[in-house]
């Protein structure tokens, strides 16, 4: 399984803008998202959209230049066969909200860590399990302005 970790993926001014937006108390989160599991999984979630038009209509047009930047900078089409996003959404886990192991749908998962002031002693990050979930394939620590790309299944 190929797990790619890229640091400092956006220019500093852009990463600061995203950090500010995501840290804003006015950013509206929903507390529940079924994901692709039959099991109810509670965590903070916000759907940006499944198409460019939907993303614009939902007020997240600021995401589209960042997507284009990542597509070009990391040649996502050549490296991963990604021609377009399937959907863009936000997940968040706060203290006491524990994530559950799950399999993502689609071909690839791309996760961007936006918070620049994240402290290592808070923990966090992403655990990627092997196929039968018996062993941890990789733990990716949370570092602001980091992109993690791995096969979704």
Which sequence ranges carry the predicted segments?
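Non-heme Fe(II)/2-oxoglutarate
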Residues: 1-81
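Catalytic core of non-heme Fe(II) oxygenases with the double-stranded beta-helix
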Residues: 57-60, 64, 68-153
């Amino acid at each position: 399984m190929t797990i790619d970790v890229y640091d400092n993926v956006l220019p500093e001014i852009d990463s600061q803008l995203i950090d500010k937006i995501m840290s804003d108390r006015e950013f509206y989160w929903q507390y529940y998202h079924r994901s692709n599991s039959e099991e109810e999984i509670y965590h903070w979630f916000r759907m940006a959209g499944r198409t460019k038009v939907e993303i614009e209509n939902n007020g997240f047009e600021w995401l589209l230049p960042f997507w284009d930047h990542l597509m070009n900078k990391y040649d996502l089409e050549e490296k991963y066969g990604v021609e377009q996003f399937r959907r863009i959404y936000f997940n968040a886990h706060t203290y006491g909200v524990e994530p559950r192991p799950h399999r993502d749908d689609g071909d690839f998962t791309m996760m961007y860590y936006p918070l620049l002031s994240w402290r290592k002693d808070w923990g966090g990050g992403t655990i990627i399990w092997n196929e039968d979930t018996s062993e941890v394939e990789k733990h990716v620590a949370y570092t602001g302005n980091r992109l993690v790309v791995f096969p979704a299944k």
